[in-house]
A protein has these predicted regions:
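Flexible cytoplasmic inter-helical loops of multi-pass small-molecule transporters
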Residues: 182-199, 390-394
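Symmetry-related core transmembrane helices of the 12-TM Major Facilitator Superfamily/SLC fold
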Residues: 163-179, 364-381
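Extracytoplasmic gate region of multi-pass secondary transporters
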Residues: 25-29, 208-261
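Conserved MFS/SLC helix-loop-helix module at the cytosolic interface between two early adjacent transmembrane helices
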Residues: 56-94, 267, 273
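Helix-loop-helix hairpin linking two adjacent transmembrane segments in secondary transporters
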Residues: 134, 138-182
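Hydrophobic core of transmembrane alpha-helices in multi-pass small-molecule transporters
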Residues: 96-110, 218, 298-311
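C-terminal transmembrane helical hairpin of 12-TM major facilitator-type secondary transporters
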Residues: 252-256, 262, 267-320
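Intracellular juxtamembrane helix-capping segments at the cytosolic ends
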Residues: 32, 111-124, 312-325
């Protein structure tokens, strides 16, 4: 029998695998630069294409999850994701990467949050923030461990063999997790009517609050996608070895564990609005330091601070959406928010790569991200307080 704690474990494995592998791609930048002579604009464009594809497919994935359940959606997406990463070993032209990231990687990314976190919201009507945080700790462990594993494989084999090993391993892990992530039986749902209540998609998607949540995601998400994509290669630019630079990604993952659990523990009490603002402060401090320092120790310290908030923000969004609109069409609404975020997330890494290619520095990129997070904070301040959720006031 599938228990809700097995669902949590399976969802965590999905997070560990998908996001950990995505983070590890940054470790391959130098190898691909040396092998093919491609610019960082090209290499970062791949992740940008994946994010955009993720957003488009997330809308579809949300609808399919609400209709058919998460298992089949996660299973198909997981196989495509793993095979896609393995296919990187066969590339010889930039368009090969674009196709792989646009289809295989993008489809895999589109389901890892929408299908898992919406399912968790149904299983845990109480303590939703903390359980979401526990699931997202899987992401943190992936961010922490898989870049180091990728660096180890590159050093002991080569980059192409590393992609094959990682990709095939991903297929098995994601198929396992797909078998465990299932919705509660109807009997379980009937015991808690909250799981059956909430705004319909057609109503919620037209509200001002929902549009603000989409805008907030669009404005802050470029930072969450750009820093993991470029921070390792930024470290090598500052004189770090490849292994030391890979530890920057692992540092984000390790710190994000603390961030996810800390915010998850208090999210249900603070509410989404305060939680957003709590997360934006350390991100702004970190971006400010990245603009001005070349000191390795300072980089590591503020990468850790950034990682705390990076992890926490991924915990904030799904429960906040449920706070305002309930669970009736949670996956479908979440898919729209993910889409809005990935539009910004797709733009961020490309512009950062272009800025580096033109200026030889990431300072302009860090400054732009800083401004976007400030704007996102302003929009958060206009959100209604938590007592204006759909359970207290229709038409949020």
């Amino acid at each position: 029998m599938i228990t809700r704690y097995l669902v949590v474990f399976g969802a965590s494995v999905t997070q560990f695998t998908v996001i950990g592998i995505l983070f590890s791609y940054g470790v391959f930048f130098k190898e691909l630069e040396i092998e093919f002579g491609w610019s960082r604009t090209i290499l970062s464009s791949c992740t940008a294409i994946a994010f955009l594809s993720m957003g488009i497919f997330a809308i579809i994935a949300g609808r399919l999850t609400d209709k058919y359940g998460p298992s089949i959606v996660l299973g198909i997406a997981g196989v495509l994701f793993g095979l896609g990463f393995a296919l990187i070993s066969q590339i010889s032209e930039p368009w090969h990467l674009f196709v792989i990231f646009g289809l295989f990687i993008g489809i895999g990314l589109s389901t890892h949050d929408v299908a898992t976190l919406s399912t968790i919201a149904h299983w845990f009507p109480k303590g939703r923030g903390l359980i979401t945080a526990i699931v997202k700790v899987g992401t943190a462990f992936g961010q922490m461990l898989l870049p180091l594993i990728a660096a180890f494989l590159i050093l002991n084999f080569d980059w192409s063999v590393a992609t094959i090993i990682i990709g095939i391993s991903a297929v098995f892990l994601l198929l396992f997790s797909a078998l465990t992530v299932k919705l509660p039986k109807k009997i379980s749902l009937d015991k808690n009517q909250e799981n059956n209540t909430g705004m319909a998609f057609s109503v919620a998607s037209k509200t001002t609050t929902f549009k603000k949540l989409c805008l907030i995601q669009f404005l802050f998400f470029p930072t969450l996608m750009t820093i993991p994509t470029h921070i390792a290669v930024h470290g090598t630019d500052l004189g770090m070895t490849q292994t030391k630079a890979a530890f920057l990604l692992s540092m984000i993952g390790a710190a994000s564990i603390v961030g996810r659990l800390a915010v998850g523990l208090f999210l249900d009490k603070m509410g989404g609005k305060k939680s957003y603002l709590f997360c934006f402060i350390p991100i702004l401090l970190s971006l400010a330091i990245f603009m001005v320092t070349t000191n390795h120790l300072l980089i590591f310290i503020f990468v850790a601070l950034y990682g705390f908030a990076h992890g926490a923000l991924f915990v904030v969004v799904p429960p906040t959406l449920a706070e305002y609109f309930g669970l009736r069409d949670h996956a479908s609404l979440f898919g729209i928010i993910v889409f809005c975020g990935t539009i910004g997330g797709a733009i961020g890494p490309i512009l950062a790569g272009m800025a580096f290619d033109l200026m030889g520095t990431y300072k302009i990129a860090f400054a732009t991200l800083f401004i976007l997070v400030v704007l996102s904070s302003v929009v958060v301040l206009t959100l209604p307080n938590r007592n204006n959720s759909i359970f207290n006031k229709q038409g949020a």
